[in-house]
Design a protein with these regions (language model features):
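Short amphipathic, helix-prone segments within low-complexity/disordered or flexible regions
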Residues: 2-3, 7-14, 21-23, 30-35, ...
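A residue-level structural signature of the nucleotidyltransferase/glycosyltransferase Rossmann-like core
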Residues: 6, 59, 153, 193, ...
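Short, positively charged and aromatic/hydrophobic N-terminal segments
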Residues: 39, 51-52
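N-terminal glycine-rich phosphate-binding loop and ensuing alpha1 helix
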Residues: 57-104
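Short phosphate-binding loop-to-helix
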Residues: 102, 108-166
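A conserved hydrophobic position in a structured secondary element of the catalytic/binding core
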Residues: 105-106, 156, 239, 286
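Conserved core of the sugar-phosphate nucleotidyltransferase
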Residues: 156-253
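Conserved alpha/beta core of the MobA/IspD/sugar-nucleotide pyrophosphorylase nucleotidyltransferase superfamily
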Residues: 219-308
Length: 308
């Protein structure tokens, strides 16, 4: 963070009087007032301040599994004529925050196809989570940080990637949230909610609706939903390299096991997670019936940029 230094009123008077000895006796620290250019943003820790001195090298990593329980072979399924994994790569390449995009997979069928337009890193097939798969890539491909992008979101807005990348500059991890706009998502345990500090750091993620509105508890769900700006968590993560490699060394945490949310392992072990608030909502392909819905959305939007 940039600072500017100015003399205190007493020091200024001494300087004008030419009494340099008096100034020296007061001491440099007593004469200087350091005024942050932004009074809200705290100083960066020394081990992290370097990220502001240059552009971070961030790599987008898309974990891709063939053996999906609800939709086997999903990454290769065509979405309006183009396989899903290629759609996701194309969207990621629209983000100027990413230096490179990598598909991380344990399946040779996905790898053989993706090599035609993207770098591929083969990973083990026993990873318990996407975070562990990303960490394996990070152990071989050096960068300042990594953005974990879901492989089933062919409409990913590059502005969300940019926001998560920017939030990572002064945090261990970063992610994104968006307002809950649909009442059907308000009490849905498959829609993860997040609450943050005033400065945008994650306090907690839950499948339950948080915060609990005590004064509105007896009201209808619609009334509760309308009375507070509830935030939906989007499944995109940014990790600093050192954070990622440390994080996967911790065992599954109690809260992670209870909620089945891997980001809680980070919070329980003291890592900070910056949450970028965005307007774009995620539209994923979870089951085969989602394909028609996504294709309709694609048809109603501008043409999609294809890989070079």
């Amino acid at each position: 963070m940039e600072t500017r230094t100015r003399l205190s009123p007493n020091a200024a008077r001494l300087a004008r009087s030419g009494n340099g000895d008096s100034v020296g006796r007061l001491g440099i620290q007593a004469l200087k007032e350091t005024a942050p250019t932004s009074p809200i943003t705290p100083p960066l820790p020394k081990d992290r301040a370097w990220v502001h001195s240059r552009r971070m090298k961030l790599i987008g990593v898309i974990p891709a599994r063939y053996a999906s329980t609800r939709f086997p072979g999903k990454p290769l399924h065509p979405i309006a004529g183009i396989p899903l994994i290629q759609r996701v790569v194309e969207r990621c390449r629209l983000s100027p925050a990413l230096s490179e995009v990598i598909v991380a997979t344990d399946d040779e069928r996905i790898a053989a196809f993706a090599r035609g337009f993207c770098r591929v890193e083969m990973t083990r097939d026993d990873h318990p989570s996407g975070t562990d798969r990303i960490a394996e890539v990070a152990s071989r491909v050096p960068a300042d940080g990594y953005i974990n992008i879901q492989g089933d979101e062919p409409l990913m807005d590059p502005a969300v990637i940019n926001a998560v990348a920017e939030a990572l500059r002064d945090s261990d991890m970063s992610t994104a949230s968006t307002p809950i706009r649909d009442l059907a998502e308000f009490d849905n345990p498959n829609v993860v909610k997040v609450v943050t500090t005033a400065g945008g750091r994650a306090l907690y993620f839950s499948r339950r609706t948080i915060p609990y509105l005590r004064d509105a508890a007896q009201k209808s769900l619609a009334e509760q939903w309308a009375s507070y700006p509830f935030q939906k968590h989007l499944g995109i993560y940014g990790y600093r390299r050192d954070t990622l490699l440390r994080l996967v060394g911790f065992p599954v945490s109690p809260l992670e096991a209870a909620e089945k949310l891997e980001q809680l392992r980070a919070l329980e072990n003291g890592f900070s997670i910056a949450v970028a608030r965005v307007e774009h909502d995620s539209v994923g392909v979870d089951v085969p019936t989602d394909v028609a819905r996504v294709e309709a959305l694609l048809a109603s939007t501008a043409s999609v940029t294809h890989c070079a």
